[in-house]
Amino acid sequence: MARRIIGTTPKQDGYRMPAEFEPQQGVWMLWPERSDNWRNGGKPAQRTFAEVAKAIARFEQVTVGASVRQYQNARARLPENIRVVELESDDAWVRDCGPTFLVNDRGGLRAVDWAFNAWGGLVDGLYFPWDKDDQVARKICEIAGVDSYRTENFVLEGGSIHVDGEGTVLTTEMCLLSAGRNPDKSKEEIEKMLLDYLGCEKVLWIKDGIDPDETNGHIDDVACFVAPGEVACIWMEDKNHPFYEQAQAAYRFLSGATDAKGRKLKVHKLCLTKKPCLLEGADTIDAVEGTIPRENGEVSIASYMNFLIVNGAVILPQYGDENDALAARQVQEMFPDREVVPVQTREVAFGGGNIHCITQQQPKTE
């Protein structure tokens, strides 16, 4: 049985969120089916999710949660070495609605179950209701037998944070200070929540992300830790690129930043796509009241930064862009001891995210 921990915080109990580059037990995913978000009833997205799951499964266990309606389909489309469990959700972004796993120095494993409101609630959320998504973290903890801390009155998505495992959190003001998350809390109060629930000592606040309309600028499209004292940051020199200013500003900030250990960060540049990724086939996405309508030509957020680090590898999104190969080379230079595994994920970008957004790693414990 997985219990709820009440009255203490992870930091008080000696728990911390480990870095993504630390050893992992496995990865969790959800199965897409939402026809008002995914093209053609979600079938192209399902094929892409399956390719991502198979790529990860070469290196560690993958568990995919599927609705009762889609369980048989998901089971049939995924190889036997990938576990499929029945798990209802409103959509398939487990990074954001799933648990943030924590470890301690004695081999313990716990998780944070953040409140989830579909990226902005009634202010600028992407759909309503979101109650099934808000239950995903607890259900995963039940399946995994992991005790959890619930932040009932604090909204946060996993894609809005990165940690180095040594006391430093990376996030954006655009997202965490947005009116749809925690409008009753000051920046200082939000920072304290991050430090207390991630077991950290310092927050690095990048001002803006590159996705103001959907996630309000998640950090996992902009920058991430690749090793202690080292970060990757998006980079663009073309002043006409839609994300030029955000990339330049993030790079300047990180180049002058120090982490919780006092180290000046080493910043690796990671290119953006040469051309913006524009939505196609919007007429195959259902128009439903209460959701944001989709139109051909919309800029989809296609960031190579939205990769996933797993044991011995990096699963890297590819978009059919001129810079795909360059991104793979740059990531290989950042991770010389890991295999870079490219997966074509343009279909996920059309839905509003990418590989990091559709996965949630569970750390390995002793």
Model-derived features with residue positions:
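Histidine/cysteine-enriched polar flanking segments
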Residues: 1-366
